[in-house]
């Protein structure tokens, strides 16, 4: 019984440590706009729904905004990730800084203005260039 509990404890500890070592991987949500962000900035392992013909990528952002925005370029610099998103028709790009605020909270900041839009009625309006994303468990 003691061995089983010890094994379980060690397994949980190693899982928690693994998550802490890869902070730029997971599913994140911005409650303010209803935007979902799915990222793995370490490896190209994700496929955007409806865009499987593009193959694996580092991530994408969808829901609460117009279309799907896919990561076309990224690099990590300590607790900050520099990301370039392109929209699903390839007409717009957006450079973003994603900074770790704490273990589960990330600050999204659009560089050079924001190209991401959402539909309001029959118009497309720009969303805020600053968003807060929280890790979804």
Name each model feature, range by range.
Residues 30, 48, 81-85, 105-110:
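Short hydrophobic/aromatic-rich beta-strand segments that constitute the beta-sheet cores
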Residues 22-51, 86-96:
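Short, solvent-exposed loop/hinge segments that bridge or flank secondary-structure elements
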